[in-house]
Amino acid sequence: MKMKKILTAFFLAVMLLFSLSASAASLGPKIRVGLVVDQYSAELSSAGKITVIDGRGKKVTLSPGRHFISVKGGRFYADKKKLSGGNLSFVAQNASQPVLVNRKKYRGALTAVMTREKKRLTIVNALPVEEYLYGVVAKEVIPLWPDEAIKAQAVAARSFALYHLDHPQYEGFDIKATDQGQVYGGIEAEHPNTTKLVKATRGVTAVYDGEPIQAFFHSTSGGYTEAAVNVWGKDIPYLQAVKDDDKDSPNYSWTKSFTEAQVERTLKQGGYDIGKLQGIRLLPLGKAPMKWSSDRGTSGRVKRMTFKGSRRDVTLTGSQVRSLLGLNSTLFEVTIGTDEPDSIDVSIKNAYGYEVGRKKIPIDKKTRQGMGTKVGDLRLFAGVKDEKVFFVGGGWGHGVGLSQWGARGMALEKSARRKKDYYKTILRHYYRGIYLEERY
């Protein structure tokens, strides 16, 4: 009888261990997220005590409150307290009083690693991929969007994360917590609805040639996505230009204007001193899909354009122009003209010629642009007072891969309501030639 009890207890323990292992496995592999990357210091805080463990297992206790972790002389410091020269782990002594990084809570483990010849640090958050996605998807889409659009975003974000696990790019971590990787907000960014839909697609991954895809995504395409080769110069088979239904996006169309002096100054600050701006050379924007050209991609996004100056001409990529001028995207037309008023103030007189009031008469905004001289693909200044450069564009982001507002548009179609797992149709539209599989 005693032996039977021992065996029963043993099997129960084995089953519990197996259950815990299976549960952990169902959350996917661990991913290391760079929260604070290559900085001189970072703020850690907790309402309770924090245990700091160095690479040799030595422990130091930090009191409740805020502490600044920094690197000096190849060693870590917590405020003025000297710590180890190796990597550090931070553990809350009370689980109900977690450690915060720059006042944000995170699941999983927190460590600090040295970078830049032991002069700077990176704070890393290691946690299962599925739990990581809880803090990503809610930051990337509006949580109350159609379920199928959110599921598509979840699969794209998961595929992107798994791709980076297979293709190490950084020292000490796998992916950044910013838009240079995927925007990740930790526990406080999570939303019950997006978490539910991440769980509904658990493990589902977009795959091409047997490996997770580099599932780029963006907010708004402006009507047509772009092929990767026309944005980054690298042909990726599954990232091609496709038509997009994102017209409901607030960034579907936009206009920004700059004076000559503003453009000249911005170019100079970026290392391109062209002197006085005289004109801009760029193939006119046509209807997508556009035929191949050296200036524009299939969607019409700018691949390159030339600023003509009194000192020299400079040719920049569309991405460089977008970054320098702070444009929403590289999908734009350029015109030169004057910023005319939106309305004219007109006097209203009675039958006797006396003014009885005034009225603002609106002016068609189309008359505000296009005053400059245009010769082929060259826009020149006409020399009139207050001329500006107008960028009339569409979309938000690089325009490659899944369009978040476009996915929403597809999910709202009638056909989407009749088809189960329509998120798969959405993914196959934006990522050509992929297949979907459960990786865990």
Enumerate the language-model features and the residues they cover.
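Conserved, single-site charged/polar hotspot
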Residues: 2-440
